[in-house]
Amino acid sequence: MQLPPWRKAVLLSAGLFCITGFASQDARAFDFFGLFGSRDTPPAISPSTVPYALTFQVAGDPDDVERALENASTLYRLRGDAPVDGDALVRRAQADFGPLLDALWGLGYYNANMVFEIGGTVLRIDSDPTAAIRVAESYRNRAVVPVVARVDPGVLFELRDIEVSDARTRRPFSAQELPPRVVKLEPGDPARAADLRAAQARMVDHFRAQSRPLAKAVAIDPVVFHPTRLMDVSYSLDPGPIAPIGNITVTGTQNVDPAVVRSFIYLEPGDPYSPDALADTRKSVGTIQALSSVRIREAETLDEYGRLPIFVEVTERAPRVVGFSARYSTIDGPAVRGYWEHRNLFGGAERLRLEADIFLAPRNDGTRIKRVGDLERSDIGGRFRASFLKPALGGTRNDLLIDGLIERDRTGGDRYGGYTSRLIDGTAFIRHRFSSTFSAQAGFQVQRGQTSDVLGQIDYLVVGTPASLTYDSTDRPLDPTQGFRINASVSPYPEFLGSSVGMVVSRATASTYYALDEDARYILAGRIGLGSITGADLDEIPANFRFFAGGGGSVRGFRYRSLGPIGPLGQVVGGRSLLEASLEARIKITDTIGIVPFIDAGGAFESSFPDFSERIRVSAGLGLRYYTAIGPIRLDIAAPLDRRPGDKPLSLYVSIGQAF
């Protein structure tokens, strides 16, 4: 059974809230943020203008009709801009007849009728406007002109005969050539113009996906029978020939070596033509930080070999950038970050980035910071990172990554303690890109540091050879609606390389995203993370290498890195293994506003593999999303479902991008 969109939203929200035991909240609470807007108020009464208030009265009151009329109406769109006189107001209304009737026909109402009432005076599509102008003027400097659009959509027309033919042969396509699941039109369906156009686009896309790049729509001919309220529609399509990819040309580079751009293009001449492959190419080339835009253009004709030439047109961005950001949560406190970046250091899209973070380090000695005067120098944590990326070594798909880090950190802030760490770290990796979605990297790491917690102080040196695999088939980095993300890493630190503690640290995370509708307004998202440390006892492992759960990227509602095995004095000391998971329902209410009910669970364990000797902690909450061009602004409120003594009942998180 196909559920309407609003039912999907209700069921998704209700399902997660039932799991978490939350009571539903009135959606009007969001009006506190001003994100749903306020009721329309006409401009103030003035001697120089004639403000009006527009109301749509639709017979039968179908919501989709009223929304379509509002979207098509100039009178509605300009309601906040009062006309200078009654004549201008009436001309606005007259200009609306055509677009509003087009909107009604587009919804399948081909016998629709409508009139405007301006101050009670009827204005028809062919009537003399003099009386309406006179009435509108009588309201000047006295009251707002009431304008009513009375609409009778009539009976919804239905489809009868649907024919799709090959423009070359004028014969209908067979079910094998064009499956009914592509057309998605049947006799008895509403004869909506938007549905007819969407079906035409689907059919063209179907043929293009069959390696027919020149597929095109030739004609669509609807015939309306008013007495029977039926429509026949015939399509004419030219599927075009099957053709492979031809020569691929990169244009638009000025200061960036085009060989670097070419290394991010995984298509080769002779490969089967595929719209998805072209979309992947655009996404892959778009990861080059030195570029601001990427456009994939297809030739209009085939070359002499019957192949389709492809043009990758790029635009470079300013090479230098300075940035600043801030984040805050009620548990983990405030943090600020600044960075400087050069995106094309030597002309090969090399990226040098210098980044500094300053944050309030929570105390783990039982004392609290209650006012500014309580701050001590040790309460300020920070990290400085310098990273360098050299893509496409020698024009290959190998990249060089070098990273240096200096950090002072402290976790804790509640009765469960934490740790203090100081470290300096250096890494060098070679990454090989197998495709636009799959890469592997391996390298060398040296880290010297000191950690201190209830288990004692550890001065350490680790020297290792980390390696990792990454697969990412998602469509958008900050707001994915489909695909998978998988990252698996293993970092051996053997003593024969000079490590003071021999161990192997492994970690894997996976997330998936599934859209329940074609417009991706209802998304189910899930994440799972695993970790393991072998080769060393718990008290030999530096505290910052041990696994903890909790925090904005783990189990929301619990303090950052506060979940794990309990050591002396009842303080959390971290574990040698980790298990965490999250489930979200991302529901768009409007194009810019969404809600996200979620549930998180996780824990760390003393053993090298999760044995559930420690309790899995669970939290749940509700998030608000404000969608922008760069990504959603995220506001999450989370609550532990199995609070420990001292845990806060609610936590607030604000950042850019989805939680995972």
Mark where each language-model region is.
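Gram-negative/organellar outer-membrane beta-barrel architecture
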Residues: 169-177, 274-486, 555-557, 561-572, ...
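Bacterial N-terminal signal peptides that target proteins for export
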Residues: 2-12
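Transmembrane beta-barrel strand/turn architecture of Gram-negative outer membrane proteins
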Residues: 424-428, 486-493, 501-534
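Periplasmic polypeptide-binding modules associated with outer-membrane biogenesis and secretion
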Residues: 30-64, 78-334, 339, 353-358, ...
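Bacterial N-terminal signal peptides
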Residues: 13-21
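Sec/Tat signal peptide C-region and signal peptidase I cleavage site
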Residues: 22-29
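Extracytoplasmic gating/loop element in the C-terminal half of outer-membrane beta-barrel translocons
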Residues: 308, 517-598, 606
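One-face residue pattern on beta-strands with alternating periodicity enriched for small/polar residues
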Residues: 335-337, 427-431, 441, 464-468, ...
